[in-house]
């Protein structure tokens, strides 16, 4: 159950981050049309929904797992969002980024053994 809640937390907060990026990309296109056009976009609403669900999953997870064990696992969002940035938004990811992601994964694996 805890692993499922952690995965749901990661996916929902990751989706929320991606939806925020899509929000600002859309807002750039409709900037001249004002706030009404911005608020008609589905992206900010998806961001709010996903982040709200991520918060709910996180709170449920914290009922079952110590925060000192659970919180480092959220660092996997850096990995998830960086991969989405690279493959969905075609943002550059260089060797330095990849090295950082590997260090994050190694750190999470190291801390996960203690949990």
Curated annotation (Swiss-Prot):
Residue stretches making up the EamA domain: 46-113
Bilayer-spanning residue ranges = 42-62, 65-85, 93-112
Q: Describe which pathway this protein belongs to, using the record's wording.
A: Bacterial outer membrane biogenesis; lipopolysaccharide biosynthesis
Whose protein is this, by species? Pseudomonas paraeruginosa (strain DSM 24068 / PA7)
The superkingdom of the source organism is Bacteria
Which BP terms does GO give this entry?
lipid A biosynthetic process; lipopolysaccharide biosynthetic process
List the signal peptide residues.
none
Q: Where in the cell is it found?
A: Cell inner membrane
This entry carries the following GO cellular component terms, namely: plasma membrane
> What are the UniProt keywords, alphabetically?
Cell inner membrane, Cell membrane, Lipid A biosynthesis, Lipid biosynthesis, Lipid metabolism, Lipopolysaccharide biosynthesis, Membrane, Transmembrane, Transmembrane helix, Transport
Xref: HAMAP family: Flippase_ArnE (MF_01869)
User: What name is this protein filed under?
Assistant: Probable 4-amino-4-deoxy-L-arabinose-phosphoundecaprenol flippase subunit ArnE
The gene designation is arnE
Instruction: Note whether Lipid metabolism occurs among the keywords.
Output: yes
Bilayer topology annotation: Multi-pass membrane protein
User: Which molecular-function annotation in GO is an example for this chain?
Assistant: carbohydrate derivative transmembrane transporter activity
State its role: Translocates 4-amino-4-deoxy-L-arabinose-phosphoundecaprenol (alpha-L-Ara4N-phosphoundecaprenol) from the cytoplasmic to the periplasmic side of the inner membrane.
Q: What is its main location?
A: membrane
SUBUNIT field: Heterodimer of ArnE and ArnF.
The family annotation for this protein states: Belongs to the ArnE family.
């Amino acid at each position: 159950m805890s692993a499922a809640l952690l995965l749901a937390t990661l996916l929902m907060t990751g989706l929320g981050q991606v939806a925020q990026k899509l929000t600002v990309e859309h807002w750039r296109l409709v900037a001249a049309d004002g706030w009404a056009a911005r608020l008609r976009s589905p992206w900010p609403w998806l961001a709010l929904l996903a982040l709200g669900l991520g918060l709910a999953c996180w709170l449920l997870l914290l009922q079952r797992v110590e925060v000192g064990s659970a919180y480092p696992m959220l660092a996997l969002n850096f990995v998830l969002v960086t991969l989405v940035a690279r493959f969905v938004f075609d943002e550059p990811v260089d060797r330095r980024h990849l090295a950082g992601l590997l260090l994050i994964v190694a750190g999470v694996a190291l801390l996960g053994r203690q949990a």
